[in-house]
Amino acid sequence: MSVGIVSYGAYIPKFRIKVEDIARVWGDDADILSAGLMVYEKSVPDLDEDTATIAVEAARSAVLRNNIDAKRIGAVYTGSESHPYAVKPTSTIVAEAIEATPVLTAADFEFACKAGTAAMQACMGLVGSGMVDLGMAIGADVSQGAPGDALEYTAAAGGVSYIIGNKESEMIAVIEDTFSFTTDTPDFWRREGMPYPEHGGRFTGEPGYFKHVTGAANGLMEKMGTKPSDYDYAVFHQPNGKFPSRVAKMLGFTKEQIKPGLVVPWLGNTYSGSCMMGIAATLDQAKPGDRIFATAFGSGAGGDAFSFRVTDKIDEVRDAAPKVLDLLKDPVYMDYAMYAKHKGKIRLA
């Protein structure tokens, strides 16, 4: 039984802070940072926004885009590394908000930045087996970065929701196949109770990101017998602008293939929403028959690769909900003081 994306929706907070405003506080060179990271600004959540509210907005957008009856959704899974509760599922909040309750299963996923794509794979299994009619997979985060840490320049906020189904007449993109590559690699971590994550600096690159993205990507192409030139678009996890550009070149993809989905320069790294946001931005532009190759990465570490084929249905639903580029328009900029307030970095003794 084939499975595919029936609908999708994204949400990005309207607030932004520029790299230069963060650099000014810490005495860093903004030009060097922006050139090195290929990131110029990042999204910031409002005072009353968290992973749950962002996930709800993305889920509502997905339901709206293809006029989905939420009661058909038999599974809601939210992937994040910033769930608002240690014990209390984000996914039940989402399910209640979209009126999908009570006949469904729900759970929260964690696998650093690829928790959302892991949720997609779980939904693929459920709908592919016929256990549920539709499954909803969400990747959402209000990413953390310690004051003065390199992560602070990129850690952003946003989320994406995908509704997975098995009826080809409803699919906007068929999921042709998926492949995962996973090892125990401690490149990035945050223990229970820690306010900010720690990371291995440059160690997060070669043995983390590049090993697992290339492992998953090459594994999928070998499994399917495809090559980069078989695809119209490609999307890779976007912790910054440099890593996805470099890994695309390593794998044989072109700048033109990754450009539509490369939103990190004006958004930042939305962690669990990162690769999923790139896929959404690509679907916003793709034509029927186009093929999309995507590989997510999560520290700890693993990569999930997917092959999508866009259907004629995309033209019917594309404009029914906000597109990623629409959500990036008309930002409201803030200085570091307001940013610190919004992110809860100001703490009273």
From Swiss-Prot:
One of its GO terms (biological process) is isopentenyl diphosphate biosynthetic process, mevalonate pathway. Keywords: Acyltransferase, Isoprene biosynthesis, Transferase. The active site is at 81 (proton donor/acceptor), 113 (acyl-thioester intermediate), 237 (proton donor/acceptor). Pathway: Metabolic intermediate biosynthesis; (R)-mevalonate biosynthesis; (R)-mevalonate from acetyl-CoA: step 2/3. (3S)-3-hydroxy-3-methylglutaryl-CoA binds at residues 29-30, 113, 154, 204, 237, 246, 269, 299. InterPro entries: ACP_syn_III_C, HMG_CoA_Synthase, Thiolase-like. The keyword Acyltransferase applies. Its EC number is 2.3.3.10. GO terms for molecular function: acetyl-CoA C-acetyltransferase activity; hydroxymethylglutaryl-CoA synthase activity. CoA binds at residues 202, 242. It catalyses: acetoacetyl-CoA + acetyl-CoA + H2O = (3S)-3-hydroxy-3-methylglutaryl-CoA + CoA + H(+). Catalyzes the condensation of acetyl-CoA with acetoacetyl-CoA to form 3-hydroxy-3-methylglutaryl-CoA (HMG-CoA). Functions in the mevalonate (MVA) pathway leading to isopentenyl diphosphate (IPP), a key precursor for the biosynthesis of isoprenoid compounds that are building blocks of archaeal membrane lipids. PANTHER family: 3-HYDROXY-3-METHYLGLUTARYL COENZYME A SYNTHASE, HYDROXYMETHYLGLUTARYL-COA SYNTHASE. Belongs to the thiolase-like superfamily. Archaeal HMG-CoA synthase family. Interacts with acetoacetyl-CoA thiolase that catalyzes the precedent step in the pathway and with a DUF35 protein. The acetoacetyl-CoA thiolase/HMG-CoA synthase complex channels the intermediate via a fused CoA-binding site, which allows for efficient coupling of the endergonic thiolase reaction with the exergonic HMGCS reaction. This is Hydroxymethylglutaryl-CoA synthase. It comes from Methanococcoides burtonii (strain DSM 6242 / NBRC 107633 / OCM 468 / ACE-M).
